[in-house]
Amino acid sequence: MSAQKPGLHPRNRHQHRYDLAALCQTTPELTSFLIRTPAGEQSVDFANPQAVKALNKALLAHFYAVTHWDIPPGFLCPPVPGRADYIHHLADLLGETTGSIPAQATILDVGVGANCIYPLIGVHEYGWRFTGSEVSDAAMSSAQAIIQANTGLSRAIRLRRQKDPAAIFTGIIHKNEFYDATLCNPPFHDSAAAARAGSERKRRNLGQNKDDALNFGGQQQELWCEGGEVAFIKKMIAESQSFRRQVLWFTTLVSRGENLPPLYRALTEAGAVKVVKKEMAQGQKQSRFIAWTFMDDDQRRRFITRKR
C-alpha cells in the first residue's frame, strides 16, 4: 500500500495508494464496490460511477472531515487528489509574496459546481474563506446542501448565483470586495458533440455502459462552451481587467498545453504584470494552471498588508 503516485504536490494527502480498509471503515458503503484486479489486488470498480462517488465520499470524510457529501446524477464527480493539488499549488503561489501561506485568504471559485470540491478542500487544509459562483440552480442547490449538512462550513463558504451566463466576475465580485485569488476549472470542449465524443472515449476506456456514462458525466456548463476552453479563458482575462485592484491573483486550469500560447498573448494584450504557470501531474495525467496579476511586487505586498 506504500507505492507513491508520481507528481503530486508534497503536501497532498493522497501520495500513496488508497488505504481501502480505512476508507471502508469511514464510509462502509464503499465496501460493496471493491473488486479484485487480475493481479489479485483489491481495488475500487472505477467503471462504476456509483463506486467512484462512494470513493469520493470516503476520501472527503476520511481526509477532510466532510461527513455529508452527495451530488445529483448527471453532474461531474471530480477526482479528489487532482483537485487537492490545485489548492496546494495555489497556496504556494499565495505564499510567495510574504514567505508564508496566508491563513485568512479569501478565494473565489468560479463555477463551484454541485460537488463544491475546491472550497471543501481549501477550508480544511488552510482555513480559507470561499465564495463560489454558479450559473446552474441545480448545482447551487447541491453545493448549498453540502455546506449546510457539515458543521462550520456555512461560516467559511458562501455561494452566489451568476445570473448572466455570459459573465464570469461581473455580478459576483461586489464593490469594495477583495480576493487573494480566483480559481476555475473551465469548460473543456467547444461543442456538445465534442463533449459527447469525449465522454464516449472515457466510457469505452473504463468499460462502462451508456447508462453509467450518463450518470456522473457532467452537465453542459461543466463540459463545454462556445469556442471551448480558450474562448472561455480569454473572456476571463478580458473581464479580469475590470477587477485588477480587487483580486491579487487570477488563476484557471488549462487542460491542454497547446492552448497556452493564445492565452499568453491575451494576457500580454490585457496588461498583466506577471504571469505564472504551475505544472501538475497525477500519474500519467498532466495538467497545469496559469495565474496572472495586474500588480507589481510592491503593490502585491501592500494589498496583502491592507487586506489583513
Swiss-Prot record:
Its EC number is 2.1.1.181. Pfam families: Methyltransf_10 (PF05971). It is an enzyme of class 2 (transferase). One of its GO terms (molecular function) is 23S rRNA (adenine(1618)-N(6))-methyltransferase activity. Keywords: Cytoplasm, Methyltransferase, rRNA processing, S-adenosyl-L-methionine, Transferase. Specifically methylates the adenine in position 1618 of 23S rRNA. This is Ribosomal RNA large subunit methyltransferase F. It comes from Salmonella typhimurium (strain LT2 / SGSC1412 / ATCC 700720). The lineage of its organism: Bacteria, Pseudomonadati, Pseudomonadota, Gammaproteobacteria, Enterobacterales. The gene is rlmF.
